[in-house]
């Protein structure tokens, strides 16, 4: 596939996902947009400057951490967009627009999955941090999307290698197996980081969103 076709495909993928996001989540607050942007930037930095590359285009990095973390702190759409935008842009800056196509889809899937498990299944926002099983639910919610990526990454990677990069079937199949192993290590390490960061950041975020207490009006002094 030509470079122009890669860019067009990436543009189509972005438009479709953004359109679906708007339909699902019609409004974003200023705080949500700001936090999503910060997490996208952290994803980009974690990938571009703190990664260990492996043969076949895969690499060890913690960029997915901020995708899942945003999904747990906010919601699945915000998490998916943070990871999709940040890590797809990282691929582009690294000179890999072909990888950016599948990256955008894969990271959005991570965010949506983590958000669905955290807020639809476990309803983490409504749980007290001292509730029985709270830590286990946080771990499962974080791991859900990240471990799903262990399977979706090689699957989409196969089609990317064959239909975008034009590689032979046997080569693409071998590369997806290598990617699957590295992705599993990424997922486990990212899950640990997400859980630790979420437990630390959730109380601070709740305090920031809590309306200030109304000050009691001073009682009028009695006339002498």
Residue ranges and their predicted role:
Residues 1-224:
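Loop-helix junctions at membrane interfaces
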